[in-house]
Amino acid sequence: MSSAITLERILALQAAYIRCIDNNALESWPDFFLDRCLYVVTSAENHKNGFEGGIIYADTKGMLTDRIAALREANVYEKQAYRHILGLPNVTRNDGDSAESETPFMVVRVMHDGKSDIFATGVYLDTYQVAGTDLKFARRLAVCDSSRVDTLMVLPL
């Protein structure tokens, strides 16, 4: 496979990423990221104001792996699942070695009793890089439209 970053490769990465989360294959989730990466879930207001912290903050693949281990082994939470709906990514920069895009998202949370609610809407601000032959996230900021977030965000967006 070519090492070029194309829209087709970005779409394939995003589709596989969402499938991983929506199908509860969370142990594979960190593999979508470089070893040195940034994953943040934040609000649009905090992002606009330049606040770096987030509802979820991880700056290494190891931190992402630890988050899933804690979710599976230590955290106590009501059983739930996500269903993601994505818009098409708008590639805002592509210099060959890395690329950036903005992708709108909506996440529906399905609770164990079958109740479904819109859980989050917003935009992914992504930076991609090629690692070997694979396209990976160097950075994924999930910028939520609302600053109102459930007190326990269990699953990654």
Q: Which residues does each predicted region cover?
A:
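Short, low-complexity N-terminal intrinsically disordered segments enriched in polar/charged residues
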Residues: 1-25, 31-35
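A short glycine-rich, hydrophobically flanked beta-strand micro-motif that places a catalytic Asp/Glu
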Residues: 27-28, 84
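Short helix-to-loop capping/linker segments positioned immediately adjacent to catalytic or ligand/cofactor-binding
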Residues: 17-19, 72-79, 112-115
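A generic "alpha-helical surface" signal
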Residues: 8-11, 55, 62, 119
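Conserved aromatic-histidine-acidic binding/catalytic patches
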Residues: 5, 52, 116
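Hydrophobic pocket/interface hotspot
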Residues: 17, 29, 64, 101, ...
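A beta-strand edge to alpha-helix "cap/lid" segment located at domain peripheries
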Residues: 81-85, 90-157
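A solvent-exposed, acidic/Ser-Thr-rich amphipathic alpha-helical stretch
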Residues: 35-104
